[in-house]
């Protein structure tokens, strides 16, 4: 191997030891600083009781570890295995991503390894470039995920003041439950009437509304009242804003990861990267189309709930109340919206990573960026898409997805969730023990033979029962008072079911006994300790 000037490159035995030590120390220092920084960040999340963000950070570490495994696998297998795989020249001359150069195919390190008429599947140089692309993709995906949660939290800060107003006297007076109003005169219904009620124009209004005032104060307060009315008591002092933040942090755990279907999308994109097809051009606009459809659908859900209030009654008492339901979402599945947002973010990160990789890699810039204007447009669309998804669509999703039929687990804080989990686990253990005892008692009862089927002593003539009979006979001179220890030893020696006297219960006692048995799985009070320790 030689450099550009034709001078042979020095291998490791010809490299000064101080140079090797300096480079190695730099790599170790940077890696240790990164690991220490992630550890400190996780400790800060735990100290601030940000369990969802801590779990997202752990998932991010797992993704980076996966990328490390892929890199290690490529490094270990590129020379002895992959570069020595030979394919026919006909198979190697189809589906090229770039135009064929006039210089011909560059010689591979293992060009002499393959027989005549065959070439290497991938050269060591192309494997190294693929290695770099996978690393750049992981970095961009993690970076875009962090930007998404940061801009979403910044957007939701504007909703905090609306939540604070719900405790004021002005809000309670404006939402007096004894006040009658016409439905079409309420602010929420009035905002979504007019052109918004026309079937053909509603989608157009919803499309443009996601860019300008996607969530207003009246929308937030109305959806908040509908959620509390459906899942909590009507006069509850519930912090809806805090609940949305926890719910969004739980969804962030999904967004930050790269699932197997997303890896499949990346593989399919690379497979369709063929010269003349323009796959990377038209596929770069797919995330934008998906995101605009998602934002339009979320705005349509708010409109449909407003129109449902209008159709339900012409006069309402108190504030207008929406009814959460899964029927407003695609296929009655609110979680599908999160999947499309996740797909959009990953595909956008893939496009930006591919752009940076092709620009920074020698030899690829002329291949992928022959049209500078189109490349610049792709970058602008990608940045605008990231801002739109992070600052508008994702916060809108966090609010509107609460209008499903079921509330999310983030309705409880960390201490309450832990207490409920302990209660459930304890109840399961007690039920398992109770079922086991009943099964053992049934097995012992079934194992007791009948009177005429076995020469063994019957239940009434067992030594334990004979002992009880002997104790009850005062005229037997041989009988003596038996100590409790002797009775216990006899019971241990002959483990049979002892008949207990039957007590008849009146109806009141039966009801009391049934209620006490229903509460048999008692939970220790320590499980419901809400201390911050």
Curated annotation (Swiss-Prot):
It is a multi-pass membrane protein. Residues 39-62, 153-251, 295-335, 401-533 are cytoplasmic. This is Protein MLO. One of its GO terms (molecular function) is calmodulin binding. Signal peptide: none annotated. The chain crosses the membrane at residues 18-38, 63-83, 132-152, 252-272, 274-294, 336-356, 380-400. The gene is MLO. The C-terminus contains a calmodulin-binding domain, which binds calmodulin in a calcium-dependent fashion. One of its GO terms (biological process) is defense response. The lineage of its organism: Eukaryota, Viridiplantae, Streptophyta, Embryophyta, Tracheophyta. InterPro entries: Mlo (IPR004326). Changing residue 222 to I: In mlo-28; confers partial resistance to powdery mildew fungus. Changing residue 30 to E: In mlo-13; confers broad spectrum resistance to powdery mildew fungus. Changing residue 270 to H: In mlo-26; confers broad spectrum resistance to powdery mildew fungus. Residues 477-487 have a biased composition (Polar residues).
């Amino acid at each position: 191997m030689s450099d550009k000037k034709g001078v042979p490159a020095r291998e490791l035995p010809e490299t000064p030891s101080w140079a090797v030590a300096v480079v190695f120390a730099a790599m170790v220092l940077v890696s240790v600083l990164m690991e220490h920084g992630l550890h400190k960040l996780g400790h800060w999340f735990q100290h601030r009781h940000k369990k969802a963000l801590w779990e997202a950070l752990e998932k991010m570490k797992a993704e980076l570890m996966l990328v490390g495994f892929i890199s290690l696998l490529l490094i270990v297998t590129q020379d002895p295995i992959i570069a020595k795989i030979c394919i026919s020249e006909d198979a190697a001359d189809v589906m090229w991503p770039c135009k064929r150069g006039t210089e011909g195919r560059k010689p591979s390190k293992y060009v002499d390894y393959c027989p005549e008429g065959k070439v290497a599947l991938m050269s060591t140089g192309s494997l190294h470039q693929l290695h770099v692309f996978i690393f750049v993709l992981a970095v961009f995906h993690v970076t875009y995920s962090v930007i998404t949660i940061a801009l979403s939290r910044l957007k939701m800060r504007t909703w905090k003041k609306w939540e604070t107003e719900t405790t004021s006297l002005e809000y309670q007076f404006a939402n007096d439950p004894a006040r009658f109003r016409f439905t079409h005169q309420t602010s929420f219904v009035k905002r979504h009437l007019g052109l918004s009620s026309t079937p053909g124009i509603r989608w157009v209004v919803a499309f443009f509304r996601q860019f300008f005032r996607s969530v207003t104060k009246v929308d937030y307060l109305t959806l908040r009242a509908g959620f509390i009315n459906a899942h909590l008591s009507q006069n509850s002092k519930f912090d809806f804003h805090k609940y949305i933040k926890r719910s969004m942090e739980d969804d962030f755990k999904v967004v930050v990861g790269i699932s197997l279907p997303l890896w499949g999308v990346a593989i399919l994109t690379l497979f369709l990267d063929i010269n003349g097809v323009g796959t990377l051009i038209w596929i770069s606009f797919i995330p934008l189309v998906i995101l605009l459809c998602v934002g339009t659908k979320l705005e349509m859900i708010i409109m449909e709930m407003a129109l449902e209030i209008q159709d339900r009654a012409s006069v309402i008492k108190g504030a207008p109340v929406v009814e959460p339901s899964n029927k407003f979402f695609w296929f009655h599945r609110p979680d599908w919206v999160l999947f499309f947002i996740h797909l959009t973010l990953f595909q956008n990160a893939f496009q930006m990573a591919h752009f940076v990789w092709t620009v920074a890699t020698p030899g690829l810039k002329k291949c992928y960026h022959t049209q500078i204007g189109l490349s610049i447009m792709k970058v602008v669309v990608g940045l605008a898409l990231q801002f739109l998804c992070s600052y508008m669509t994702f916060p809108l999703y966090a609010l509107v997805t609460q209008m499903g039929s079921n509330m999310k687990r983030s309705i409880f804080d960390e201490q309450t969730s832990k207490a409920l989990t302990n209660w459930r686990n304890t109840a399961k253990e007690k039920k398992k023990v109770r079922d086991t005892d009943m099964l053992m008692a049934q097995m012992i009862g079934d194992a007791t033979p009948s009177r005429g089927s076995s020469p063994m002593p019957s239940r009434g003539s067992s030594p334990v029962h004979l002992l009880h009979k002997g104790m009850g006979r005062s005229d037997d001179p041989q009988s003596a008072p038996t100590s409790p220890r002797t009775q216990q030893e006899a019971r241990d020696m002959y483990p049979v079911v002892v008949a207990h006297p039957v007590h008849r219960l009146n109806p009141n006692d039966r009801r009391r006994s049934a209620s006490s048995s229903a509460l048999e799985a008692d939970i220790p009070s320590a499980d419901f300790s809400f201390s911050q320790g």
